[in-house]
Amino acid sequence: MSIFRFIDAEKASYPVAMLCRMLGVSKSGYYAWRTRPTSKRSREDVNLTERIREIHSRSRETYGYPRVHAELRLLGVRCGRRRVARLMRAAGLRGCMRGKKRRTTRRDPRAAPAPDLLRGNFVAGQPNRVWLADITYVPTQEGFLYLAIILDTHSRKVVGWSMDTHMRTELVVDALEMAIWRRKPSAGLVHHSDRGAQYTAISFGKRLAEIGIVPSMGRTGTALDNAMAESFIATLKTELVHRRRFPDREVARSAIFEYLEGFYNRRRLHSALSYQSPMSYEEATMEGAAVA
Protein backbone atom coordinates (compact mmCIF):
# COMPACT_ATOMS: atom_id res chain seq x y z
CA MET A 1 0.00 0.00 0.00
CA SER A 2 1.38 3.42 -0.95
CA ILE A 3 1.80 6.23 1.59
CA PHE A 4 -0.94 8.28 -0.06
CA ARG A 5 -3.29 5.29 -0.09
CA PHE A 6 -2.61 4.77 3.61
CA ILE A 7 -3.41 8.43 4.33
CA ASP A 8 -6.63 8.09 2.35
CA ALA A 9 -7.63 5.05 4.39
CA GLU A 10 -6.90 6.75 7.73
CA LYS A 11 -8.19 10.28 7.04
CA ALA A 12 -11.50 9.56 8.75
CA SER A 13 -9.64 8.96 12.01
CA TYR A 14 -6.81 11.49 11.81
CA PRO A 15 -6.32 14.94 10.19
CA VAL A 16 -4.73 14.79 6.76
CA ALA A 17 -2.19 17.48 7.70
CA MET A 18 -1.00 15.47 10.70
CA LEU A 19 -0.73 12.24 8.69
CA CYS A 20 1.25 13.98 5.94
CA ARG A 21 3.61 15.55 8.48
CA MET A 22 4.18 12.24 10.31
CA LEU A 23 4.81 10.35 7.08
CA GLY A 24 7.04 13.01 5.53
CA VAL A 25 4.91 13.92 2.51
CA SER A 26 3.23 17.17 1.48
CA LYS A 27 -0.49 17.88 1.59
CA SER A 28 -0.31 19.15 -1.98
CA GLY A 29 1.25 15.87 -3.07
CA TYR A 30 -1.53 13.91 -1.36
CA TYR A 31 -4.30 16.00 -2.98
CA ALA A 32 -2.58 15.76 -6.36
CA TRP A 33 -2.60 11.98 -5.95
CA ARG A 34 -6.29 12.08 -5.03
CA THR A 35 -7.26 13.97 -8.19
CA ARG A 36 -5.00 12.01 -10.52
CA PRO A 37 -6.95 9.74 -12.93
CA THR A 38 -6.81 6.07 -12.03
CA SER A 39 -4.41 4.16 -14.28
CA LYS A 40 -5.64 1.43 -16.60
CA ARG A 41 -3.58 -1.12 -14.67
CA SER A 42 -5.16 -0.06 -11.37
CA ARG A 43 -8.66 -0.36 -12.82
CA GLU A 44 -7.80 -3.80 -14.15
CA ASP A 45 -6.48 -4.79 -10.72
CA VAL A 46 -9.76 -3.75 -9.11
CA ASN A 47 -11.79 -5.83 -11.57
CA LEU A 48 -9.42 -8.78 -11.31
CA THR A 49 -9.56 -8.66 -7.51
CA GLU A 50 -13.34 -9.00 -7.69
CA ARG A 51 -12.99 -12.10 -9.89
CA ILE A 52 -10.44 -13.47 -7.45
CA ARG A 53 -12.78 -12.87 -4.51
CA GLU A 54 -15.58 -14.74 -6.31
CA ILE A 55 -13.36 -17.75 -7.04
CA HIS A 56 -11.95 -17.78 -3.51
CA SER A 57 -15.48 -17.66 -2.09
CA ARG A 58 -16.71 -20.48 -4.35
CA SER A 59 -13.77 -22.59 -3.18
CA ARG A 60 -15.02 -22.19 0.41
CA GLU A 61 -12.05 -19.89 0.97
CA THR A 62 -9.68 -22.86 0.54
CA TYR A 63 -7.84 -21.94 -2.68
CA GLY A 64 -4.41 -20.35 -2.61
CA TYR A 65 -3.09 -18.36 -5.54
CA PRO A 66 -2.07 -21.37 -7.74
CA ARG A 67 -5.63 -22.75 -7.88
CA VAL A 68 -7.19 -19.30 -8.16
CA HIS A 69 -4.85 -18.59 -11.09
CA ALA A 70 -5.74 -21.94 -12.69
CA GLU A 71 -9.47 -21.23 -12.45
CA LEU A 72 -8.99 -17.76 -13.92
CA ARG A 73 -7.26 -19.38 -16.89
CA LEU A 74 -10.16 -21.82 -17.29
CA LEU A 75 -12.47 -18.79 -17.39
CA GLY A 76 -10.36 -17.23 -20.13
CA VAL A 77 -8.76 -14.55 -17.93
CA ARG A 78 -5.12 -13.96 -18.86
CA CYS A 79 -2.88 -12.88 -15.99
CA GLY A 80 0.28 -14.04 -14.25
CA ARG A 81 0.54 -16.11 -11.09
CA ARG A 82 2.59 -13.45 -9.33
CA ARG A 83 -0.08 -10.85 -10.06
CA VAL A 84 -2.76 -13.11 -8.57
CA ALA A 85 -0.57 -13.71 -5.51
CA ARG A 86 -0.01 -9.95 -5.09
CA LEU A 87 -3.70 -9.10 -5.37
CA MET A 88 -4.68 -11.88 -2.96
CA ARG A 89 -2.18 -10.59 -0.40
CA ALA A 90 -3.51 -7.06 -0.80
CA ALA A 91 -7.10 -8.30 -0.36
CA GLY A 92 -6.23 -10.45 2.66
CA LEU A 93 -7.15 -13.70 0.87
CA ARG A 94 -5.25 -16.91 1.48
CA GLY A 95 -5.61 -20.65 1.06
CA CYS A 96 -5.74 -23.33 3.74
CA MET A 97 -2.60 -24.74 5.36
CA ARG A 98 -2.40 -28.45 6.10
CA GLY A 99 -1.98 -29.91 9.56
CA LYS A 100 -0.49 -33.25 10.58
CA LYS A 101 -2.51 -36.46 10.14
CA ARG A 102 -2.99 -38.66 13.17
CA ARG A 103 -2.89 -42.43 12.93
CA THR A 104 -6.37 -43.99 12.86
CA THR A 105 -6.12 -47.67 11.91
CA ARG A 106 -4.55 -50.35 14.10
CA ARG A 107 -2.97 -53.55 12.86
CA ASP A 108 -4.27 -56.96 13.97
CA PRO A 109 -1.09 -58.92 14.85
CA ARG A 110 -2.89 -62.22 14.13
CA ALA A 111 -3.81 -61.30 10.55
CA ALA A 112 -1.73 -62.07 7.47
CA PRO A 113 -1.55 -58.87 5.38
CA ALA A 114 -1.50 -58.87 1.59
CA PRO A 115 1.78 -57.89 -0.12
CA ASP A 116 2.42 -54.30 -1.21
CA LEU A 117 1.88 -54.45 -4.97
CA LEU A 118 2.27 -50.72 -5.57
CA ARG A 119 5.51 -49.88 -3.73
CA GLY A 120 4.56 -46.22 -3.74
CA ASN A 121 3.69 -46.14 -7.46
CA PHE A 122 0.12 -44.83 -7.61
CA VAL A 123 0.06 -44.04 -11.34
CA ALA A 124 -2.82 -45.55 -13.33
CA GLY A 125 -3.46 -44.69 -16.98
CA GLN A 126 -7.17 -45.48 -16.82
CA PRO A 127 -9.95 -45.42 -14.21
CA ASN A 128 -10.68 -48.58 -12.20
CA ARG A 129 -7.13 -49.91 -12.27
CA VAL A 130 -6.09 -49.00 -8.71
CA TRP A 131 -8.20 -47.93 -5.74
CA LEU A 132 -6.76 -46.54 -2.51
CA ALA A 133 -8.57 -46.79 0.83
CA ASP A 134 -8.21 -45.10 4.20
CA ILE A 135 -10.11 -44.26 7.39
CA THR A 136 -10.27 -41.06 9.40
CA TYR A 137 -12.33 -39.60 12.20
CA VAL A 138 -14.20 -36.32 12.54
CA PRO A 139 -14.74 -34.86 16.04
CA THR A 140 -18.19 -33.53 16.94
CA GLN A 141 -19.68 -32.36 20.23
CA GLU A 142 -21.65 -35.61 20.22
CA GLY A 143 -18.57 -37.83 19.72
CA PHE A 144 -16.48 -39.06 16.80
CA LEU A 145 -17.86 -39.72 13.33
CA TYR A 146 -15.71 -42.19 11.38
CA LEU A 147 -15.24 -41.93 7.62
CA ALA A 148 -13.91 -44.58 5.24
CA ILE A 149 -13.05 -43.52 1.70
CA ILE A 150 -11.92 -45.13 -1.56
CA LEU A 151 -10.05 -43.09 -4.20
CA ASP A 152 -9.43 -43.98 -7.82
CA THR A 153 -5.74 -43.22 -8.36
CA HIS A 154 -6.25 -42.21 -11.99
CA SER A 155 -8.39 -39.16 -11.22
CA ARG A 156 -8.19 -38.85 -7.41
CA LYS A 157 -11.99 -39.16 -7.47
CA VAL A 158 -13.71 -40.44 -4.32
CA VAL A 159 -15.58 -43.45 -5.70
CA GLY A 160 -16.76 -44.91 -2.41
CA TRP A 161 -17.30 -43.67 1.13
CA SER A 162 -19.05 -44.65 4.34
CA MET A 163 -19.70 -42.87 7.65
CA ASP A 164 -20.67 -44.35 11.01
CA THR A 165 -20.23 -44.10 14.77
CA HIS A 166 -17.68 -46.96 14.77
CA MET A 167 -14.64 -48.06 12.78
CA ARG A 168 -15.37 -51.78 12.60
CA THR A 169 -14.96 -53.79 9.41
CA GLU A 170 -18.51 -52.93 8.29
CA LEU A 171 -17.38 -49.34 7.80
CA VAL A 172 -14.84 -50.22 5.10
CA VAL A 173 -17.10 -52.89 3.57
CA ASP A 174 -19.84 -50.28 3.09
CA ALA A 175 -17.39 -47.93 1.34
CA LEU A 176 -16.29 -50.82 -0.88
CA GLU A 177 -19.89 -51.70 -1.75
CA MET A 178 -20.55 -48.11 -2.84
CA ALA A 179 -17.46 -48.14 -5.06
CA ILE A 180 -18.43 -51.48 -6.61
CA TRP A 181 -22.00 -50.29 -7.26
CA ARG A 182 -20.84 -47.03 -8.80
CA ARG A 183 -17.93 -48.27 -10.88
CA LYS A 184 -18.68 -51.93 -11.67
CA PRO A 185 -14.96 -52.76 -11.90
CA SER A 186 -13.46 -55.61 -13.90
CA ALA A 187 -11.49 -58.38 -12.24
CA GLY A 188 -7.87 -57.54 -11.59
CA LEU A 189 -8.40 -54.09 -10.07
CA VAL A 190 -5.98 -53.48 -7.18
CA HIS A 191 -7.39 -52.30 -3.82
CA HIS A 192 -4.58 -50.76 -1.76
CA SER A 193 -4.78 -49.86 1.94
CA ASP A 194 -2.68 -49.98 5.06
CA ARG A 195 -2.63 -53.12 7.23
CA GLY A 196 -5.35 -51.96 9.60
CA ALA A 197 -7.51 -54.66 11.17
CA GLN A 198 -10.53 -53.54 9.12
CA TYR A 199 -8.73 -54.29 5.84
CA THR A 200 -7.12 -57.57 6.95
CA ALA A 201 -10.46 -58.92 8.25
CA ILE A 202 -11.60 -62.19 6.66
CA SER A 203 -14.99 -60.75 5.66
CA PHE A 204 -13.37 -57.87 3.80
CA GLY A 205 -10.92 -60.12 1.96
CA LYS A 206 -13.76 -62.46 1.02
CA ARG A 207 -15.75 -59.63 -0.55
CA LEU A 208 -12.72 -58.52 -2.58
CA ALA A 209 -12.26 -62.07 -3.84
CA GLU A 210 -15.92 -62.35 -4.87
CA ILE A 211 -15.48 -59.39 -7.23
CA GLY A 212 -12.03 -60.40 -8.42
CA ILE A 213 -10.34 -57.40 -6.76
CA VAL A 214 -6.70 -57.93 -5.81
CA PRO A 215 -5.70 -56.73 -2.30
CA SER A 216 -2.50 -54.77 -1.71
CA MET A 217 -1.33 -53.41 1.64
CA GLY A 218 1.34 -51.00 2.75
CA ARG A 219 2.58 -50.70 6.30
CA THR A 220 0.19 -49.38 8.94
CA GLY A 221 1.01 -45.85 10.03
CA THR A 222 3.54 -45.31 7.21
CA ALA A 223 2.25 -42.39 5.15
CA LEU A 224 4.42 -42.99 2.06
CA ASP A 225 2.93 -46.46 1.54
CA ASN A 226 -0.53 -44.93 1.03
CA ALA A 227 0.48 -41.35 0.28
CA MET A 228 -2.33 -40.41 -2.11
CA ALA A 229 -5.10 -41.48 0.27
CA GLU A 230 -3.30 -39.82 3.19
CA SER A 231 -3.03 -36.63 1.11
CA PHE A 232 -6.77 -36.65 0.46
CA ILE A 233 -7.53 -37.07 4.16
CA ALA A 234 -5.22 -34.13 4.93
CA THR A 235 -7.05 -32.03 2.34
CA LEU A 236 -10.45 -32.92 3.80
CA LYS A 237 -9.29 -32.05 7.31
CA THR A 238 -7.69 -28.78 6.21
CA GLU A 239 -10.48 -27.53 3.97
CA LEU A 240 -13.47 -28.68 6.02
CA VAL A 241 -13.02 -30.40 9.37
CA HIS A 242 -10.49 -28.06 11.00
CA ARG A 243 -12.52 -25.01 9.99
CA ARG A 244 -15.81 -26.13 11.56
CA ARG A 245 -17.19 -27.11 14.95
CA PHE A 246 -19.88 -29.74 14.44
CA PRO A 247 -22.62 -29.87 17.10
CA ASP A 248 -23.48 -33.48 16.27
CA ARG A 249 -22.71 -36.32 13.88
CA GLU A 250 -25.64 -35.58 11.58
CA VAL A 251 -24.41 -32.06 10.86
CA ALA A 252 -20.91 -33.42 10.24
CA ARG A 253 -22.28 -36.15 7.98
CA SER A 254 -24.17 -33.61 5.85
CA ALA A 255 -21.14 -31.32 5.57
CA ILE A 256 -18.84 -34.19 4.55
CA PHE A 257 -21.34 -35.49 1.99
CA GLU A 258 -21.62 -32.03 0.42
CA TYR A 259 -17.83 -31.63 0.40
CA LEU A 260 -17.22 -35.01 -1.25
CA GLU A 261 -20.02 -35.03 -3.80
CA GLY A 262 -20.73 -31.34 -4.29
CA PHE A 263 -17.26 -29.82 -4.16
CA TYR A 264 -14.27 -32.19 -4.23
CA ASN A 265 -15.29 -34.60 -7.00
CA ARG A 266 -17.07 -32.05 -9.19
CA ARG A 267 -15.36 -28.69 -8.74
CA ARG A 268 -12.11 -28.73 -6.78
CA LEU A 269 -9.11 -28.16 -9.06
CA HIS A 270 -6.26 -30.61 -8.46
CA SER A 271 -2.66 -29.63 -9.19
CA ALA A 272 -1.72 -33.20 -10.16
CA LEU A 273 -4.55 -33.24 -12.74
CA SER A 274 -3.35 -30.13 -14.59
CA TYR A 275 -5.77 -28.11 -12.45
CA GLN A 276 -8.89 -30.02 -13.43
CA SER A 277 -11.48 -31.50 -11.08
CA PRO A 278 -11.50 -35.31 -10.68
CA MET A 279 -14.76 -35.58 -12.62
CA SER A 280 -13.56 -33.36 -15.47
CA TYR A 281 -10.30 -35.28 -15.68
CA GLU A 282 -12.11 -38.62 -15.94
CA GLU A 283 -14.47 -37.26 -18.59
CA ALA A 284 -11.50 -36.04 -20.64
CA THR A 285 -9.87 -39.47 -20.31
CA MET A 286 -12.99 -41.26 -21.51
CA GLU A 287 -13.45 -38.83 -24.42
CA GLY A 288 -9.84 -39.40 -25.45
CA ALA A 289 -10.32 -43.17 -25.30
CA ALA A 290 -13.48 -42.93 -27.42
CA VAL A 291 -11.69 -40.89 -30.10
CA ALA A 292 -8.78 -43.33 -30.17
Positions of the model-derived regions?
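Charged DNA-binding/catalytic regions of mobile-element recombinases
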Residues: 1-292
